[in-house]
């Protein structure tokens, strides 16, 4: 929950930071900015000003997307996506049975119950991913 609140507050801060100068500039200053842009265009060659991207010539709006580990959570149940998928498959498929057959083992018919977990690559080895 803390990560979610932190991400939302950071996104709001960036959003307000991007739009605060555009709302705070008075009309008189906007004319000065346009005059400065015209002066800059006259100093630069026509080719450079035509080939420059729009963000250099005039300010354009930008969309900032923030990713959070909470995005993998289901909002209804609060479960991660891979656990939700295992729960939707049914309780009989959530656990798998493995039988190991070994000739020298004392009891070769012991069944081992393993949970289906998501695997993440850590270095060169796949290890189970734990929830944060």
UniProtKB/Swiss-Prot annotation:
Task: Tell me a Gene Ontology molecular-function term this record carries.
Answer: melanin-concentrating hormone activity
Q: Does the keyword Protease apply?
A: no
One matching Pfam family, short form? Pro-MCH
One annotated GO biological process: chemical synaptic transmission
Swiss-Prot/TrEMBL keywords: Cleavage on pair of basic residues, Disulfide bond, Hormone, Neuropeptide, Signal
Which tissues does the record link to its expression?
Pituitary gland. Produced in neurons of lateral basal hypothalamus which project both to the brain and to the neural lobe of the pituitary gland from where MCH is released.
Q: Which InterPro entries match?
A: Prepro-melanin_conc_hormone (IPR005456)
May I ask which residue range the UniProt record assigns to the signal sequence? 1-24
Q: Which family does it belong to?
A: Belongs to the melanin-concentrating hormone family.
User: Which function does this protein serve?
Assistant: Plays a role in skin pigmentation by antagonizing the action of melanotropin alpha. Induces melanin concentration within the melanophores. May participate in the control of the hypothalamo-pituitary adrenal gland axis by inhibiting the release of ACTH.
In Swiss-Prot or TrEMBL terms, this protein is called Pro-MCH 1
Q: Which organism is it from?
A: Oncorhynchus keta
Recall the taxonomic lineage recorded for the source organism: Eukaryota, Metazoa, Chordata, Craniata, Vertebrata
């Amino acid at each position: 929950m803390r990560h979610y609140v932190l991400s939302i507050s950071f996104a709001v801060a960036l959003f307000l930071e991007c739009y605060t100068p555009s709302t705070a500039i008075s009309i008189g200053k906007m004319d000065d900015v346009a005059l400065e842009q015209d002066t800059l265009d006259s100093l630069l060659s026509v080719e450079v000003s035509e080939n420059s991207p729009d963000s250099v010539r005039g300010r354009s709006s930008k969309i900032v997307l923030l990713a959070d580990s909470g995005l993998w959570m289901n909002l209804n149940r609060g479960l991660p996506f891979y656990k939700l998928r295992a729960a939707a498959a049914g309780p009989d498929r959530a656990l798998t049975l493995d039988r190991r057959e070994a000739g020298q083992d004392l009891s070769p018919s012991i069944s081992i119950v393993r949970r289906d977990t998501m695997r993440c690559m850590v270095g060169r080895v796949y290890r189970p991913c734990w929830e944060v």
